[in-house]
Amino acid sequence: MEYRVHARRIDAHGSLATAKQAEVTLDTDLAGRRDAMNPVELLLSALAACMLKGIERVTPMLHFQIDGAEVRLEAVRQDAPPKLTLIRYQIVVDSAETEQRLDL
């Protein structure tokens, strides 16, 4: 599979990423902005989407019945050099399945 994303700077306060027919406003403002995700939040969102898509892929194979699922992520970043030093996540599944089956 191949993927394509195009991102462009709108102004000093934000950028716009597009893929297929979807658009995502990017927080590229040095001061930050509340109405858009910054690069780390986008990375965590992509990781959450991968986990949720994995759940969608596996549940039919295992004949699971789920009513909902959510992923909570948090990251810690150091400043010098700038890098993520920790990513922690929790997956919460709403299902009538037994704990033993959910552990699969």
Language model segments and positions:
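Extended beta-strand/beta-hairpin segments
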Residues: 1-45, 53-104
